[in-house]
From Swiss-Prot:
Gene: argE
Main localization (coarse): cytoplasm
Protein name from the UniProt record: Acetylornithine deacetylase
Pathway(s) this gene product operates in, as recorded in its UniProt entry: Amino-acid biosynthesis; L-arginine biosynthesis; L-ornithine from N(2)-acetyl-L-ornithine (linear): step 1/1
Residues noted as binding Zn(2+) 1 in the record, renumbered to the chain: 79, 111, 168
């Protein structure tokens, strides 16, 4: 029996008011269980079969809701978590949906709890008894940190939809490619001493100077050797993000730490990048093997592309009257792409994500509902 669920606004409010912060800082990190339980109840009320999966060794959960059976169909996906927030910079309650000036404000309003509210609104208005292929709804955990929700899902699922749509905020532009992300920290350990006698110590900043020179050669190599014309910045980028070292003007610096990131383009794998980093740093690492240490800062995200010759892209482009494009930020797409052709298409601007007073503009509501309806009609009826 299908039960009536609350209105779009009431559902949206209820999703925003449940904190689901993901953070690498354990003091800020929160479970998403209450959110997943609520979302599960909404889909259960709409006659979906719902399963919640705990991410091993965490208090985080994925939800997979399904109606219909058989092969193919459509998977609509989003992440349940949000980033943390600076209360001093917010002028509104992050956990209370505030509607004003044709905008919906709240933490996760655009990234990306609003997408779930819109899915529920559409599902509640269609006749799901007539579908011939399944509709899947996936809500993942930890997208904002290590993407362990998506990684865990693809390792355990057996479903094979015809198409996956991730509803990240793209201003309803169709995205078929994005860069990846890798981050590293290099630590150089020297020997301190008084600066009046430099030969009685080892200056870690001087060694780091040679490390940086090698990294800049690598940066140039990426720009010259790898190109992807669909990106506004068509080559892999490297950013030397921060450097710290030294404690006093009259001391030889004993420790210097450099953090940097690389954003690879499709066609350049994480393994390839790791190999070329080792190659470019090989000489200096051999010279100072006991003084230079490199480690990953965060879990790496591969670059992603759903090829333009994919039948799925052609179907969705025609259906939604959109042309696909590439972006520089990361999503769960490279992981979900392993089980089915995956595209990114969702309401709101990425410029509002992770910002104080995050909001979803009202004018995205009806067009998003129209697109979700078209996608369901195409892939499931």
């Amino acid at each position: 029996m299908i039960r009536k669920i609350p209105s779009f606004i009431e559902v949206y409010k209820s999703l925003i008011q449940i904190p689901t912060i993901s953070s690498n800082n354990k003091l800020l990190d929160q479970s998403n269980k209450n959110f997943i339980d609520l979302l599960s109840n909404y889909f259960s009320d709409l006659n979906f079969s719902v399963k919640n999966y705990q991410i091993p060794h965490t208090d985080k959960y994925n939800m997979l809701a399904c109606v219909g059976s058989g092969n193919g169909g459509l998977l609509l996906s989003g992440h349940s978590d949000t980033v943390d927030f600076d209360e001093k910079k917010w002028t509104k309650d992050p956990f209370k949906l505030t509607e004003t000036n044709n905008k919906f404000y709240g933490l996760g309003a655009v990234d990306m709890k609003g997408f779930f509210a819109l899915i529920l609104e559409v599902i509640s208005s269609i006749n799901i008894k007539k579908i011939i292929k399944p509709i899947y709804i996936l809500a993942t955990a930890n997208e904002e940190t290590d993407m362990s929700g998506a990684k865990n899902f693809i390792q355990s699922t057996i479903i094979k939809p015809d198409c996956i749509i991730i509803g990240e905020p793209t201003s309803l532009k169709l995205i078929n490619a994005h860069k990846g992300h890798m981050s590293y920290s290099i630590k150089v350990i020297g020997d301190t001493g008084h600066s009046s006698n430099p030969d009685h110590g080892v200056n870690s900043i001087e060694i780091m100077h040679d490390v940086i020179r090698s990294l800049l050669i690598l940066k140039k190599y990426f720009k010259e050797e790898y190109q992807h014309p669909n990106f506004s910045i068509p080559y892999p980028t490297m950013n030397l993000s921060s450097i710290h070292g030294g404690s006093a003007i009259n001391r030889i610096c004993p420790l210097c730490i450099l953090n940097f990131e690389i954003r690879p383009i499709p066609g350049l794998t994480l393994t390839q990048i790791e190999i070329v980093i080792k190659e470019k740093l090989e000489t200096i690492m051999k010279k100072w093997s006991h003084r230079i240490f490199i480690k990953k800062l965060f879990s790496s995200v591969p670059a992603y592309e759903c090829p333009h010759n994919s039948g799925t892209i052609k179907i969705v482009e025609k259906l939604c009257q959109l042309n696909s494009a590439a972006v520089n930020y990361c999503t769960e797409a490279p992981f979900l792409q392993r089980i089915a052709p995956t595209l990114i298409l969702g309401p709101g601007s990425i410029e509002q994500a992770h910002q104080p007073d995050e909001y979803l503009e009202h004018y995205f509501i009806q067009p998003t509902k129209n697109i979700i309806t078209k996608l369901i009609n195409k892939f499931c009826y």
